[in-house]
Amino acid sequence: MEVVLVSVWGFMDVYKLHPKFDLILDRFDTIQKEFKDNLEHIQFGHWYDDFAHSKSGGIYNPVAAPLYGELDQEQEQLSMIEQFGKDFYEKDGLRTHKNVNWVPTLTKTLQDIGITRRASIARMKPKAKIPLHRDGDPNPPDGILLRGIIGLDVPVEEGKKCYIMVRDRPKKTWHTRDIKNKSICLFQPNAIHSVINQINGWRYVVLFDTVVWFENYPEVVKSCRTTGVWANLD
């Protein structure tokens, strides 16, 4: 399994954050089957605060299906709460959407791994592109927010692929990673990035947020202070 963290200051091993991440691979067949079997029941909404993700021709497209998020991170979940307020409830200390009932193995696996800040399922149209942008999610004062993409149901088509490009600011280069079934890419969402789907089919991924806490990774703090890019200035 290829596991990559792309950020403005370099790479990081995802297993340092979530050592049990291989549970996704161990349970992937069940996770994918549950998703495919229940796709018609899953509710998708939009991130109306992110035009690059959600807007096309002046019309918002349903692109994200919320699963859960931490109770004290309401601002990050606000657009989904406003759309699906009645469908959220509290479970195990998390703000949970009824979508989790259709993907129980995925939900349990993410939480077994220790991913609690936010999780959702995102879809992308055939032959579509999310243009270069940066997400507006703020970093916590004592850490750095990271976003993960797990390939959940990505069609296979010869000569075509779905991929993400993330800018490496210090090197003035781009990191490119394919998005395919079982692939995992973890990056800093307020780094400039773009997603391209060349495939003639809908692409579905799991999106999740997690945090590198400075107290646990002092080398990250040292690197950020040395490079001066921790504040994501461009």
Residue ranges and their predicted role:
Residues 11, 59, 131-133, 207:
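Intrinsically disordered, low-complexity peptide-like regions
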Residues 99-185:
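Catalytic core of non-heme Fe(II) oxygenases with the double-stranded beta-helix
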